[in-house]
Amino acid sequence: MLRVARLSRLALLSLTAVIFSGCANINLISAVGSSSVQPLLSKLSSHYVLNHNDKDNLVEISVQAGGSSAGVKAITKGLADIGNVSKNTKSYAEENKQLWMDKKLKTITLGKDAIAVIYKAPSEFKGKLVLTKDNLNDLYDLFAGSKSVDINKFVENGQTTKNSNHNLIGFPRTGGAFASGTAEAFLKFSGLTQTKTLDKDSKEILEGQRNYGPNARPTSETNIEAFNTFVTTLRQPNLYGMVYLSLGFVNNNMNLIKSEGFEVLKVKYDNNAVTPSSQAVSSNTYKWVRPLNSVVSLLPKQKTLPSIQRFFNWLLFSNNSEIKKIYDDFGVLELTADEKKKMFKTGNAEMSNIANFWVDDYSLNNQTFGAL
């Protein structure tokens, strides 16, 4: 049966582009990498294609997930036009310094996301669990899976609940921090100062050097797959646990999270227990934050480079209210002017100075890798 009426505007544009390919220059841009960057960039690129496309230089943008390591591999090996990475790219750049320089790679920070932990607990524990600098290592031991960690470790003020001992299950990302930007942010960017050194075994497991222990249930990389594994496993009676997710995902699915009986873990900074939220990130009271980055090659022979530059110029410097709405919908914070300046070689973060923005990472004065 003919179903043209059901085609989305984007599908119609793609079909039109194919039919009239002789009448317009169509640039196909591919983006691969972080599952946290993917939904945001997909929405932004779809909006751009539908509303701001240059009729004389049509562009189509395909955004696929796969993890931050896949994004770095794709951009360094020329398998994609954009590599998406939800972590600081400095370690990748230093590991592949000559290749990074030869390809003139530039890290573009799209915005800021945060990590949030959600948990399932017995009714007597609901609202009572708090992460602090004193039990941070217990959280890491839980997700490493090599030790049994009781829920009472996270009860505020150390007040245990009589006859209520429940070992938790951690749901980490497969491959650990080596493969996942979300996992790296979970391990390294809590904003809490550990009071004790993390157990060597737990550290190596979470870094991805060793396999998870028997008490962990590793999940796929994407937020939705991690959440679904968490939900499905913990529907069994008397099982309790924790999973870390993108704050944007948590914000957008809060009703579902609450309907399943889950809670969001508070984090205590300077004696103030903070619930993760976009407002708390913006005010710097919640510090478990990571960058959402795209990496592109600035080599002149890159055929899609002009189209890529037009897209990111629109995204970062047009001050378009539609962009802000998309960011708000995903719970992602836009960069401040000062943060954008870090991606420029000189001067201010304005379109009038855009030539100084399109400078590769190793040619910047401070050799910065994105804005954060």
Curated annotation (Swiss-Prot):
Lipidation (S-diacylglycerol cysteine): 23
Topology of the protein relative to the lipid bilayer: Lipid-anchor
Highest taxon above the source species: Bacteria
Lipidation (N-palmitoyl cysteine): 23
Sorted UniProt keywords: Cell membrane, Lipoprotein, Membrane, Palmitate, Signal
Cell compartment(s), UniProt: Cell membrane
Stretch forming the signal peptide: 1-22
GO CC term (a single one): plasma membrane
Name recorded for this polypeptide: Uncharacterized lipoprotein MG412 homolog
Originating organism: Mycoplasma pneumoniae (strain ATCC 29342 / M129 / Subtype 1)
Phylogenetic lineage: Bacteria, Bacillati, Mycoplasmatota, Mycoplasmoidales, Mycoplasmoidaceae
